[in-house]
Amino acid sequence: RGRKALAMQIEHMEEAKFTEVTIATIDSPGLFSQIAGVMAAHSINILGAQIYTRKDGDVLDVLQVNSVHGEIVSKPEKWRKLEDDLTEVFEGRVIVEDLIGKLQTPSFYTPKSRHAPRPNRIEFDNEVSDNYTVIDIFATDKVGLLYQITRTLKELGLYIAVSKIATKVDQAADVFYVHDIFGQKIVDPVRIDTIRQTLLERLE
């Protein structure tokens, strides 16, 4: 109690043309989805993301981001507004969907590439980790994609412990280590198929 909702630090990587954003906060269900949603609302593109969750409930999210035009987002006032919006979302004063509706344009969720998109693909692996089901998602990259994915995982009752986000040309390759509300892997074939189909429908 008495702690700030978050601490945020940004570092511009001029040569690589992205900004590294480090967010420290307290873990809560759907946290990564909230972060992805606020970024999307501000038209900030997430190139990569690493989530680190400690046993005491503290979370460190490190994101590599740029603008939808592939440029560094350099205006300090934009970052101040984004931090304010994140704080309000974390504290429950603002809902992410409302923020997106207020700040975004009709082109939201449209693919960023003009190339014909490759089919979206989702793979599940219960062998690579002892504690988590690993979901690999290959999808056409677009602003708001990560928010769509993480919001859907939350709605399906999945908790993200580790995430590895990468974008190559026009396709995102996102990896999520997940478990259910009881901390168990997802092993039921019917549930796995439901998760896959729901994600594919949302990503259309």
Language model regions located:
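Non-catalytic interaction/regulatory segments
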Residues: R1-E204
